[in-house]
Amino acid sequence: MRFISTVTKRRPFQAPNDLVHPLSNILGSLVTYDSRLHLPQPKDRQCSTLVPLYRRLLKATRRFWDPMASQILISHFQAYARKARKSNPNPHKRRIKRFRNLLKTFACRIERANDGDHQAIWQTLRYAYSQTGPLRHRRLHYLQDNKIRPSKIPKSLPSNSPVRLPYISSLLSAVFEINMENAKIRHLPSVIFDGLIEKNKDRPYHINLSCKRAYDELLPRIAVPLLPHEYHHLHSLLLDVTLRNPQISRPPFAPLNPRKGFCRILQRSLITFLSAVCYLPYNPHPTSKPVVSWDSLSDIQLRLNVGKVLKKSVKKR
C-alpha cells in the first residue's frame, strides 16, 4: 500500500536587498543578503604565501655545488628578507607580488643551475661573486672612497690646474688599468676626461656634466675584482672538477644532458666565469702603510698595495 506524502517543499528565504546581514557587525562593513560575501584576507596571510617560495629558494641554494657561493647567497637572501620585513611589516599587494616574482626567478634559476644548465650556472656565479646585482654595488662602494669623490659637482674649475674628473680613488684607478690590460674597456677615464676638458675649455660647467656622464657610462662596464680567497677557491674548485673529484663529479642530482657529464659542464662554466672577471694583485704584508682596507663578506680585511700596481702599469706603457 502506497503512502502519499503530504509534506510540501519549503520555498527558500528571499530577503529584501536592503536587509542587513548579521556579519556586518563582525566584519565592520555593510553586508546584505544579496551581496557576494568576500572575507577580507589579512596582510600577514598574504605575506605567508611567500614562505614556501622562500624555503624553496633556500633549499635550492643549499644544494648548489659551490659551497662558498651557496654560503654567500644564503646570507644575502636572509639579510634581504630581514631588511624587507623590518622596513615594511605590512607591504602592499604590489610589493608582495614583486617579492613573489623575485623569489620565483631566483629559485628557478638556481634549480636550473643544479640541474646542469650552463647559462644558469654562469648567472648564479656572477650574482654570488659580486659581478652583478646589489653585491656588485657594495663592492664598488669599497673600491671608491666617498671622501675622494665629492657629493656635488663644482660649477667652475680653477684655472691653470690639472683637472681629472671625476675624483677616482687610487684603488679604482688600478682596477681601470687592469680592465684595460685585459681588454675589458677600451679607454681609461683620464683619456676620456682630458679630451672633454680640451674641447670645452671655455665652458667649465659642461666639462663637469660631460665627465660625470662619461664616468657613469664607463663604470658599469668594468669587471669588479675578486677577493683573494674567492679567487683561490674558484681555482681549487676548477682543479677538483678537472681531476674529477668524487665529491664534485657525483652530485646528489642528475644533469639535464647526461651525455656531456656534469664535470664538463662545471669546467666550462668556471673557465667562462674566470675569463670574464678581474683579479687585483695585492701584497698581504705591505711594508708601508696600507692604502685601502677592504672588508669582504666574511669580515676579512684585505690590504692592497696599489702603488706597485700603478707603477707596473705605467712602465708597460
From Swiss-Prot:
Superkingdom classification of source: Eukaryota
BP-aspect Gene Ontology terms: mitochondrial gene expression
Gene Ontology CC: mitochondrion
Pfam families, per the entry: LYRM2-like
InterPro entries per record: Cup1-like_N
Protein name per the record: Uncharacterized protein C17G9.13c
